[in-house]
């Protein structure tokens, strides 16, 4: 049993002004929606599995998250290489990796993510129960090293401001290489996506998980519209073709077939090991998912608007036009689900993106409406598309990826 601690510190930087929304009192009107106590999508039982699902689950632990995601094997297979890299393949020290994961789980109020990674953090990364509780207290809590405070601050900035601040970037670079900063960024972004899925699909705790989200303090605040200006020049410059290694040329070959390589891909070439898993997942969401083109583009462009990712917006205007949206409808995406003119279906899709941004959870009202139009696989892909493009937005904003000339700006 974890002993009671002092109330959690609000999200302050020592000696600085308040950067993020203040902590929300338990039960406050504008706080978090209660999390689900039963699954929205039930884990697959052994008697109902296809050969493809059996193959997917054969190499995974008997956890509810995998048995739930087995409803969409194609999505899982395209996403899991990224997840494996972040969990097992990155160069981040295990303690620092788990601090990042747990902080994001706390900010998203994902009890499953918290319980699983508290277990991993204690067993594999040397964190104590006291350390884990302090993660919920945040960067202002006593006992952190300066760099651990920086990591916690990074997660807070990515959740609330959808980018890493200049001060935090410089503090990260004092210890980490550029590749390691990218890994830390993607670790936070991946576990925001994971939290969105766990919360919205109603994945319930596995037997034997002992840790729970702390209840003896204030909740974190839900996220709102980011306020900081976006970068006007790259922090990580796109890699010039003359500097590409043979490995990087092979990675980028598909993009070269369609013309000049975009800044997004040339920037991500700075981390060739991450490039492949990131592209495999992103290309599924962009081209191969089961979602209708209009649904996909609504999610992508609304997520771009909510995160202040103008690069993402600019590159999807043409795709939205091809999906059948008029210029007026594209402008209306930025106004959100309450703008007049949306169908019930499309308003619910936009509202899902808003709710995932706000509290990493699709509300019962929105889920019920979506379920009138989409089957189980497509419901999962709605969450993953919003979460996946949030991940891309955090990278775009934090790395300073600049929009190429000729692409539309935000209306």
Language-model segments: residues:
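Universal eukaryotic N-terminal targeting presequences
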Residues: 1-3, 18, 25
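Bacterial N-terminal signal peptides that target proteins for export
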Residues: 1-12
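Hydrophobic alpha-helical segments
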Residues: 26-411
């Amino acid at each position: 049993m974890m002993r009671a601690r002092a109330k959690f510190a609000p999200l302050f930087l020592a000696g600085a002004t308040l950067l993020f929304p203040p902590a929300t009192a338990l039960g406050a009107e504008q706080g978090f929606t209660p999390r689900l106590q039963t699954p929205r999508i039930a884990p697959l039982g052994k008697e109902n599995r296809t050969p493809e699902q059996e193959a997917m689950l054969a190499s995974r632990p008997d956890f509810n998250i995998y048995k739930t995601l087995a409803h969409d094997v194609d999505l899982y297979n395209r996403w899991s290489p990224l997840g494996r890299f972040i969990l097992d393949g990155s160069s981040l020290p295990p303690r620092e990796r788990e601090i990042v994961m747990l902080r994001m789980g706390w900010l998203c109020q994902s009890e499953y993510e918290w319980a699983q990674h508290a277990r991993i953090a204690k067993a594999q990364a040397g964190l104590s129960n006291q350390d884990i509780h302090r993660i919920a207290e945040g960067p202002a809590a006593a006992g952190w090293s300066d760099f651990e405070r920086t990591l916690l601050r990074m997660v807070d900035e990515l959740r609330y401001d959808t980018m890493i601040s200049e001060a935090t970037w410089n503090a990260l670079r004092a210890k980490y290489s550029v590749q390691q900063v990218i890994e830390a960024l993607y670790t936070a972004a991946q576990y925001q996506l994971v939290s969105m899925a766990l919360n919205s699909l109603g994945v319930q705790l596995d037997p034997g998980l002992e840790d729970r989200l702390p209840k003896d303090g204030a909740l974190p605040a839900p996220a709102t519209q980011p306020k900081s200006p976006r970068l006007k020049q790259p922090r990580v410059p796109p890699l010039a073709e003359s500097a590409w290694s043979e490995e990087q040329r092979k990675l980028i070959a598909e993009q070269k077939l369609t013309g000049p390589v975009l800044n997004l891909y040339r920037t991500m070439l700075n981390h060739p090991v991450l490039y492949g898993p990131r592209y495999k997942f992103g290309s599924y969401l962009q081209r191969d998912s089961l979602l209708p083109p209009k649904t996909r583009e609504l999610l992508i462009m609304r997520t771009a608007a909510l995160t202040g990712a103008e690069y993402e917006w600019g590159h999807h205007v043409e795709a939205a036009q091809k999906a059948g949206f008029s210029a007026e409808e594209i402008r209306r995406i930025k106004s959100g689900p309450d703008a007049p003119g949306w169908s019930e279906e499309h308003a619910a899709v936009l509202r899902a993106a808003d709710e995932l941004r706000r509290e990493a959870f699709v509300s019962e009202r929105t889920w019920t409406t979506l379920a009138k139009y989409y089957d189980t696989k497509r419901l999962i892909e709605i969450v993953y598309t919003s979460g996946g493009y949030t991940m891309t937005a955090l990278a775009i904003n934090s790395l300073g990826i600049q929009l190429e000339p000729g692409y539309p700006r935000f209306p």
